[in-house]
Curated annotation (Swiss-Prot):
Pfam family, one: Oxidored_nitro
Function text: Component of the dark-operative protochlorophyllide reductase (DPOR) that uses Mg-ATP and reduced ferredoxin to reduce ring D of protochlorophyllide (Pchlide) to form chlorophyllide a (Chlide). This reaction is light-independent. The NB-protein (BchN-BchB) is the catalytic component of the complex.
Superkingdom per UniProt: Bacteria
InterPro entries from the UniProt entry: LIPOR_BchN/ChlN, Nase/OxRdtase_comp1, Protochl_reductN
Protein name: Light-independent protochlorophyllide reductase subunit N
PANTHER family: LIGHT-INDEPENDENT PROTOCHLOROPHYLLIDE REDUCTASE SUBUNIT N
Keywords: 4Fe-4S, ATP-binding, Bacteriochlorophyll biosynthesis, Chlorophyll biosynthesis, Iron, Iron-sulfur, Metal-binding, Nucleotide-binding, Oxidoreductase, Photosynthesis
EC number: 1.3.7.7
Amino acid sequence: MNTPKSIPSGTCRDTPVLKERGQREVFCGLTGIIWLHRKMQDAFFLVIGSRTCAHLLQSAAGVMIFAEPRFGTAILEETDLAGMADAHEELDREVERLLSRRPDIKQLFLVGSCPSEVIKLDLARAAERLTQVHAPHVRVLNYSGSGIETTFTQGEDACLTSMVPVLPTTDQKELMLVGALPDVVEDQAVSLLSQMGIGPIRVLPAPRTAETPGVGPNTVFACLQPFLGDTAAALTRRGAHHIQAPFPFGEEGTTLWLRAIADEFGVDDDTFDRVTAAPRARARKAIANASEHLNGKSVFFMPDSQLEIPLARFLTRECGMEAIEIGQPFIHKGLVGPDLDLMPAGPTISEGQDVDKQLDRVRAAQPDLTVCGLGLANPLEAEGLTTKWAIELVFTPVHFYEQAGDLAGLFSRPVRRRAVLKLEAAE
């Protein structure tokens, strides 16, 4: 079997973490609804929030409300915020109206926001009450997407965590893939694993409530995203076993992720090589073509999407880049530890954010590429730095072999663009 690169002796797992707890620049967890509502076809996400929440979702999703997407906002008015109206009665009325108009809804999520958190609206109690009213046709769950409690991708983690306690119990040995991916990418993963003889394979979240996976002591699960720490913990409490592995970004990460699952199911080396040889070769070729402008360049990750550590591993080991600092909102070593193990010590590893201090470090380092949020990119570009929007890495298919070249291309394009602009300026 073609083995990945050797693991360095001194790794980033041993690097002391710089913990920062200052001002931060990041989206709230409501943004997870943008991809979750597309994945879960008979679910509806009802945000209990303000007009700002509604505008965020509508503009980010690029969907007009009259198109009847699978999300909406129950607006908290001034009377609700002032305690002059019974918010629970109004919520019950809105849910009744929604479900009568949309009989296709099988699962309803009540999603908390900053305003609902501030007035201490008990959405957990509301979900229990509404489940009793609308069962068995509709199951009502709740989670928080509030910016007070969550950052960007944590919304998906909170959503999936809310589902785990109501998953059916099973004693069957099954593989559960945890995390929402575009259908075409998920199909690639399932196809590779199925060709190795691994199965049954279930997915959380399932596209329809009737296909919801069971969980029990014989369930093994692998996370598809590095921001699902609470979901992994909840599944473990239900008796499931977590397969730890680097995340499937690039050829190396995908191979090691598949290998960890294959080992769990007793797949021999010949079968593994037969299934993965061709896509691995395609991935290596695509990465080599796309990363030509990345080799020898430096990269600075500001905390945003929770993808930072696995992506830094991909860029340093497969694209020849040097990481100066790898910032991540939260570091869950139970998930990203295998990626940290593959990176040699050297980069600063930071958790959380104090944005002014971090900007000072960016300016001092002058990296060839800075991966950051939308609000920071344009000011840094104006200062002459090359940036990549972190949000693109969440909304673009980047997992597994067939997307490896596209992933490298996302980073190389801004570097190439900067080089062309410098050349034109010199002329």
